[in-house]
Amino acid sequence: MSVLSAHVLEEIRELPDKYPQHRSAVMPALDLAQEELGYLTPEAMSEVATALQLDPGYVEGVATFYTLFHLKPIGKHMFYVCTNLSCMLRGANEIVDHLKGAIGVHEDGEVSKDGLFSYEEVECLGACEFAPMMRLDHRFHYDLTPEKIDALLAERRQSPSPPRAEGQGEGREPAPPMRKRTKKSG
């Protein structure tokens, strides 16, 4: 019996047609499997390998290399909080402390008692100009404050399942440079 639904397996089988190299489909395929199950089981990785006609060791290698793939159960809503230098200097540690207290966990990766939330500290999400920031349910959230965290938690407690991503984040545009670049005269 398959652990992945027929619909997800069909989506996975269609992925290679979207990429110039067949193997490039493995990450979106693993993402589909994880979205359906909540995390990647050995059986799910095997089914992804079979559906993509790839070596199971390759699929497992990709799943274990990238931190956004999970091999054990996580909360329904996963907070990835950037704690790299830019975010740390703008309050990421306070955001992490507030989040941990609000969801009732003590460690990175721990699941809240109600099973709804987990968090993980990550090195960089590529939006330093919006620090502190995080990714939640495939969406980026910027300029975080404890109040924004509380609002997101309240919203997610009402949500039956994580929303599918539509765009990258909150619609923010990067700040313009503080001064214009000039060509060096040579």
Task: Pin down the residues of each PLM region.
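Signature of N-terminal electron-transfer/Fe-S-associated modules in redox systems
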Residues: 1-160, 164-186
